[in-house]
């Protein structure tokens, strides 16, 4: 009996000395739970605000808020073409920039006839570096540009190891994915600042979310574009300029035609038209968004994954696509 009493006494002493630590752990646990709940509530509210409310209460008057003319780079296919069409639906005149004159003429004519807006185009190959911009400067001179969409981008032929990439591919990716956005902003931003209104949309990628092996240079270039956009937003928001970074996941376009899985529209891989119709409704509402509600869920989960899990999954997925592309190439 005495042994039992001694044990009870010892237990009470230990419990008394540990009570402070138990209370501290309880406070930490409560704080963590509240923080996670608030994050969930905020993310849910953000998704509703971005992707549901604009459809219910009506979208902003883009022409009135930003201006009558928009410039869209990489605008003869995929997201660029679809985004240009969405702008035209809202009464915005479009200036298309791409490297194929035939495609530019066809898309320009189609948009003008379908949406009854003015269109123009400039032939420019962004992979050529500095020489591409003189024609652009001349073409945009004396134009009051209200919206700039930096969509032009270069992707790998298929996911691959860094040492397998050619020097030409590396330079082209730097010129197209990084330099083009800098130069286009540098050309049109002064006019926007002078009018104290304008919008710049830079199409980044969800690969900027975390390091993405086998898309190393592409992912890094899109991470640059994302950071560039976010810094530019804070730098010029007070001057009436809205800057947005779009960070979509895979969209079923020609850019990802290396795989039958990613090039076909599905639940997680929307068409360019479907994506653009959602993305444009976020203009003026979010400085950084995947632009599509399903991609927003994926992006939120991706950001919260440990880096090694993201990297493992990305490399596994990229290896499958690479194998498929090489098999198809060998036939």
Swiss-Prot record:
It is an enzyme of class 1 (oxidoreductase). GO terms for cellular component: endoplasmic reticulum; mitochondrion. GO terms for molecular function: oxidoreductase activity. The active site is at residue 218. Residues 2-82 are annotated as: Required for mitochondria translocation. It is found in: Mitochondrion. Substrate binds at residue 205. Its main location: mitochondrion. NADP(+) binds at residues 74-80, 125, 222. GO terms for biological process: fatty acid elongation; steroid biosynthetic process. It comes from the Eukaryota. Its EC number is 1.1.1.-. Pfam families: adh_short. Keywords: Lipid biosynthesis, Lipid metabolism, Mitochondrion, NADP, Oxidoreductase, Steroid biosynthesis. Belongs to the short-chain dehydrogenases/reductases (SDR) family. 17-beta-HSD 3 subfamily. May catalyze the metabolism of steroid hormones and thus play an important role in sex differentiation, the emergence and maintenance of the secondary sexual characters, and the regulation of endocrine. This is Hydroxysteroid dehydrogenase-like protein 1. The lineage of its organism: Eukaryota, Metazoa, Chordata, Craniata, Vertebrata.
């Amino acid at each position: 009996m005495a042994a039992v009493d001694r044990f009870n006494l010892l237990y009470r002493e230990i419990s008394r000395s540990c009570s402070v630590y138990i209370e501290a752990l309880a406070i930490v646990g409560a704080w963590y739970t509240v923080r996670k709940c608030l994050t969930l509530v905020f993310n849910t509210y953000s998704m509703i605000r971005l992707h549901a409310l604009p459809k219910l209460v009506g979208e902003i008057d883009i022409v009135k808020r930003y201006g009558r003319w928009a410039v869209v780079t990489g605008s003869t296919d995929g997201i660029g073409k679809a985004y240009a069409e969405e702008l035209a639906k809202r009464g915005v005149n479009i200036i298309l920039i791409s490297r194929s004159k035939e495609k530019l003429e066809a898309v320009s004519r189609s948009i003008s006839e379908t949406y009854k807006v003015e269109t123009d185009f400039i032939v420019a190959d962004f992979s050529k570096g500095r020489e591409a911009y003189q024609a652009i400067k001349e073409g945009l001179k004396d134009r009051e540009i209200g919206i700039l969409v930096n969509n032009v981008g270069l992707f790998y032929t298929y996911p691959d190891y860094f040492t397998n990439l050619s020097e030409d591919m590396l330079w082209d990716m730097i010129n197209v994915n990084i330099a083009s956005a800098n130069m286009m902003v540098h050309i049109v931003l002064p006019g926007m600042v002078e009018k104290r209104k304008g919008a710049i949309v830079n199409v980044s990628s969800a690969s900027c979310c975390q390091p993405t092996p086998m898309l190393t240079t592409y992912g890094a270039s899109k991470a640059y574009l994302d950071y560039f956009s976010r810094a530019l937003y804070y730098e010029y928001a007070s001057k009436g300029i809205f800057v947005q970074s779009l960070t979509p996941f895979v969209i079923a376009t020609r850019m990802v035609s290396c795989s039958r899985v990613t090039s076909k529209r599905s639940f997680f891989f929307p068409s360019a038209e479907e994506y653009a119709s959602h993305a444009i409704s976020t203009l003026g509402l979010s400085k950084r968004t995947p632009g599509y509600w399903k991609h927003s869920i994926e992006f939120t989960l991706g950001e919260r994954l440990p880096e090694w899990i993201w990297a493992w999954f990305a490399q596994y997925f990229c290896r499958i696509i690479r194998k498929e592309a090489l098999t198809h190439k060998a036939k």
